[in-house]
Amino acid sequence: MSESIICVADDVGARVWLERVLESEWNLECLSSTDLSRVSRLVQATGAPVVLVAIDENDANRALKVFAAIQKACPNSQLIGVAHRLSQDLLLSIMRAGARDCLVTGVDADTARDRVRRIADSAAQAPTAAPSAGRGDITLVVSASSIVDTRFFCQNFVAELNEYQAGKSILAMDSNSEANRTFYFDNLSRLTLDELISRGDSIDRSLVETALEEYQDGLRLLSGDISSELLKGDAAADLYITISQLATLFDHMVIRVDPAHTGEWLRAIGANVNRIIVVTHPVVDQVQATETLLQEIKEWVAPECSRYIAVDGYHRRASLSLSDIEKTLDQKCDLVLPMEWRFRLDAMNAGLPMANMLHKSTYHRNMGGFIRTCCATGETRRKFTFKRAAV
């Protein structure tokens, strides 16, 4: 998968047909035509080269309105109609509305993918700005098991990342958190991710600076409790739009994803993720589950997306060695973190990253080395300061 294609369809049959004939060549973002504002904002957010619009022959005017809205929002997107039946008059109407082609579900199954590819290729050759222009990096932190404490990992990852990326703005997002908490940090932000998604309007820098607390210089926190319902259908499109808008306001976004929703997050925003960190314990069943998760990740992210393995709680005298883990995953373990349970407890209870505790730990040193290698090459080290004391 190299890019996203948007499908605007109220008819489930048309969506299923497109998923089948297009196979997995594109990431198909589906939503209904009931909210033209949502359709337009998603087209703008994705910069999708092709938009497929299902046409109901009994209500063709709705499809024509969708064509008009998309052309206004993103004139460079190429439009393709999809219909179960197609009269000559209807074909002329949608072509006048700007469609480059129209696929008929009962006839064009064998040729649909090639026709869409030709139009997508022609759109890619047009002299337009890249869809990701002006968009910051997006890093997902995931795990195959809920036993893994990705909250603690993210707490230290974002603090260390912020320390090494001087002059950059970072948004740390916990997609499944308690009220007023982001990871183990106290969060005094006025808005949650759920509320940003439900706003239905644009997110600008003024809103971010007012509503999201700056925990450290350059680091802001955002909490959420994203349920399965917000990761499906039109709600998933709203999530994509919100994440895309936030990504234009920050140099780097780090999102902790709950293991129960990893697949849904990958389907929703995987095409625009720059980096995925998979955290696992050195336990056989978790390593095997991580192997399966890595295969799923490949289906939803772009080839240039960097993928890293972090082994948390490793002990070199344990029977499961790093080489065994790497052999199973067919991938190098990029970060190895010791348990150091007492130090972890102190950091969790204090609501502070390891870097700001009195004791210096191997965990902190290894995390810093990982950041320097993978995320902060050439960056100037930031002087570490706190905006407020932990409660």
Where do the model's predicted regions map?
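Conserved phosphotransfer microenvironments
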Residues: 38-39, 49-70
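Conserved catalytic-core segment of NTP-binding enzymes
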Residues: 241, 247-252, 257-335
